[in-house]
């Protein structure tokens, strides 16, 4: 069978099984008696730009769920999430409790890593280099430099090129997305307005990014040079974005996604995948809702399937949403980290 006759899912499954076999051999101690495998293991590259940018591609089409403990992580894995994001508090609780929001307890993150088989991500404060170094040492699969947590640096983000672990960053527009890419991010997510259960800001940010990419495509070279200066990014990055007609890295949607219909809407708008925060575990039906959101994200092109996903949940059990217009300017999380 030729490679191009295989589906992406079959290829992905093959590589996962290959990794499992390698781990079994390594754990059994047989690696010491198989010099060729030992040599291969020592030459495997990790942390390269290619590896860091490839990892998010394997999450495409899927849902990453915010969780705070092992039980929630297991629910997410059983529902079909492609990864989990570990926090100390869900965004809704961060918003309600106030104070300083920091990186989750490393012990909790470690427990989650030992309890599930899907990738584990965790958040750090914007600009907090050392929280990121701790998560890298812990062995998380991806770091989210997140506006949901209280920024450690109001002016600068982390230089992500210095790390071997991939990073995801939020963006509201193309300028923010390309600046984070230039800093070394491997994935972008729309900021939306986390912890509200209101998808309107995520919709707005996704549409802004798409619109600004379309404008870039029709610009002259001279105008693109001006735009690169405006965005404060290398011209080559602007040129590449115009050439491929999309962001150079994976772009997920996040912020206020609470229902299967929300999930399908963001995929329809062009998201490569989804981050779902408080919408799952601040609802009264997290098990069913997690499965329904995953189904809707995977089958967004088929309204009849999304309808069945929507029927799996009860609107009366959805999280209590927050009207964006009721928030004061200082209460908006999306304005952190421009």
From Swiss-Prot:
Leading EC class: lyase
SUPFAM superfamilies attached to this UniProt entry: Ribulose-phoshate binding barrel
InterPro entries, per database record: Aldolase_TIM, PdxS/SNZ, PdxS/SNZ_N, RibuloseP-bd_barrel
Binding site for D-glyceraldehyde 3-phosphate: 207
Keywords: Lyase, Pyridoxal phosphate, Schiff base
Chain ranges passing through the membrane: none
Record: active site: 123 (schiff-base intermediate with d-ribose 5-phosphate)
HAMAP family per record: PdxS
Protein task: Catalyzes the formation of pyridoxal 5'-phosphate from ribose 5-phosphate (RBP), glyceraldehyde 3-phosphate (G3P) and ammonia. The ammonia is provided by the PdxT subunit. Can also use ribulose 5-phosphate and dihydroxyacetone phosphate as substrates, resulting from enzyme-catalyzed isomerization of RBP and G3P, respectively.
Record-stated family: Belongs to the PdxS/SNZ family.
NCBIfam families documented for this protein: PRK04180.1 (NF003215)
PANTHER family: PYRIDOXAL 5'-PHOSPHATE SYNTHASE SUBUNIT SNZ1-RELATED
UniProt-recorded name of the protein: Pyridoxal 5'-phosphate synthase subunit PdxS
Species whose genome carries this gene: Saccharolobus islandicus (strain L.S.2.15 / Lassen #1) (Sulfolobus islandicus)
């Amino acid at each position: 069978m030729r490679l191009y006759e295989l589906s992406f899912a079959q290829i992905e499954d093959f590589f996962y099984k290959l990794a499992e076999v390698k781990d079994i051999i390594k754990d059994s101690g047989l690696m010491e008696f198989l010099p060729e495998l030992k040599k291969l293991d020592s030459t495997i590259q990790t942390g390269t730009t290619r590896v860091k940018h490839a990892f998010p591609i394997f999450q495409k089409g899927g849902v990453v769920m915010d969780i705070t403990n092992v039980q929630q992580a297991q629910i997410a894995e059983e529902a079909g999430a492609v990864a989990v994001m570990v926090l100390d508090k869900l965004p809704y609780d961060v918003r309600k409790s106030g104070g300083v929001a920091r990186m989750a307890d490393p012990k909790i993150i470690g427990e989650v890593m030992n309890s599930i088989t899907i990738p584990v991500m965790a958040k750090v404060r914007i600009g907090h280099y050392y929280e990121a170094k701790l998560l890298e040492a812990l062995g998380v699969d991806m770091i989210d430099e997140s506006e949901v947590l209280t920024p450690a640096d109001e002016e600068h983000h982390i230089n992500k090129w210095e790390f071997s672990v991939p990073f995801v960053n939020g963006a509201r527009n193309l300028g923010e997305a390309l600046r984070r890419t230039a800093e070394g991010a491997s994935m972008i997510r729309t900021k939306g307005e986390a912890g509200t259960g209101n998808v309107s800001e995520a919709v707005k940010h996704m549409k802004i990014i798409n619109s600004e990419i379309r404008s870039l495509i029709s610009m002259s070279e001279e105008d693109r040079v001006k735009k690169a200066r405006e965005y404060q990014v290398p011209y080559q990055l602007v040129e590449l974005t115009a050439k491929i007609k999309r962001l150079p890295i994976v772009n997920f949607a996040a912020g206020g996604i609470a229902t299967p219909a929300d999930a399908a809407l963001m995929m329809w708008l062009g998201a490569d995948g989804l981050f779902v925060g408080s919408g799952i575990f601040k609802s009264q039906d997290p098990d069913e809702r997690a499965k329904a959101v995953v189904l809707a994200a995977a089958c967004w092109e088929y309204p009849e399937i999304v309808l069945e996903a929507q029927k799996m949940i009860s609107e009366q059990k959805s999280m209590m949403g927050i009207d964006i217009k009721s928030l004061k300017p200082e209460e908006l999380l999306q304005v952190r980290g421009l």
